[in-house]
Amino acid sequence: IEDRIVFVHGDVCDRELAETTLRDQAVDVVVNFAAESHNSLAVVDPTRFFRTNVLGTQTMLDASRAAGVERFHHVSTCEVYGDLPLDTEEVFSEESPYRPRTPYNASKAGADHAVRAYFETFGLPVTITNCSNNYGPFQFPEKVIPLFTTNALDDLPLPMYASTQNKREWLHVLDHCEAIDLVLREGRLGETYNVGSGVEATIEEIADLVLLHTGKPESLKTIVPDRPGHDRRYVLDATKIRDELDWEPSRGWDEGLAETVAWYEENRAWWEPLK
């Protein structure tokens, strides 16, 4: 596939570069993954997140309009909906109101609204997916599963926020990509599809599983002060994409996590320079 890839290094907010690239490469479909996504950094430097996530998305929307693309797909997050209590079975559907609680969440919510506005105002052919927390190989080591795994492999502490029982829904990156591909090919224009696995785990449960798979002691678990605006729980209702597009996640949680930990064990040369 390498001979079919052209890599262009640039700023997602550079409209001239975006327009030139889409035109020169005769791009017919845009999938917008570009985002600042780490909540812990968003509370330190919110401007960086709003610039990339909102203005960057608008830049790509304008460039896509100018290029006359056939489809613009925007990749978003469950976090735009806010958070859920820990003691409830409630889940977020595509009809749930947007209630972002952090700068990152708000920046992604703003991007979602921009995408819908370009559909309603300009007729740009768009779709949106909102996904739960991803995991899998090649994930940047700032994220919790690769952070815990790489720290454990180096016998370093696994830093857990004081709210260790906060829950996340976990989706393997390949299941996510298969869902995006399906929405691109068969999704209805102007629609949003939630992509979730239904698998929930607390941060402490993640730490315990990583320590189990790496054979490291529980003494590596370390409590650190909580971050501002730390959401309690996210879970998505993926009924719409399952019923309309016949999508199902195909990778089990236990197997997927074990394979992910093994990947980091076997690919130290990839992640060590990034830490």
Name these PLM-found stretches:
Residues 20, 41-44, 139, 143, ...:
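Generic recognition of short, well-ordered alpha-helical segments
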Residues 83-84, 137-138, 244:
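Residues that scaffold the ATP/ADP-binding catalytic core of kinase and kinase-like folds
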Residues 1-134, 174, 203, 259-267, ...:
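N-terminal Rossmann-like NAD(P)+-binding domain of SDR-like oxidoreductases, especially those catalyzing
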Residues 6, 10, 152-275:
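C-terminal substrate-binding subdomain of Rossmann-fold SDR/epimerase-dehydratase oxidoreductases
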Residues 87-90, 141-149, 210:
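A glycine/serine/threonine-rich, flexible loop-to-helix segment
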